[in-house]
């Protein structure tokens, strides 16, 4: 009797295995987890490559206060679990570079230009949304960089090709204007404690950039006049 019972259970388990193997919900979450792991690994690889390429005379360091502030803003996003980290480059040129997985690189020039807490929150929050919406990963895939960088990840550290990694990083940096900056602006504002106040602060800051920077050096973060227009049109929830 026990033998038949055990046999029946084995048959039942075997019959369930194909169903579980193709379970779309399980497959979705497994794929999502794998993609997140790949995203974090790619971000770490790009960050290390960026740091290795940086000239010694320009200092770059992690900013604990800004990192904590970014993580606090990320609590209101769909990807609060990522380890958001802010690196600051000692450069007068305002710039910001979101990397996959949670790293944000900003210049001291950008932080100096952001004269209020609301403006700094805007910078951090919009980059939280870039990362939360996987804009950096979409850019990597759209530019055809994904297979190459995955291949480098699978290679042992000491055997990775620095020339290939350098090209990946440069191609990514060159195409940052293609990120959806308008969407990051509009959704990032909603992460802050006072979206309306942040919106006004953002408009003021971007207008100052459009006068000082945009006419002579189009900024990497998209079409400034168009971004300002979208922020001015934005209707916030009551």
Feature annotation, model-predicted:
Residues 137-163:
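Post-HEXXH active-site segment of zinc metalloproteases
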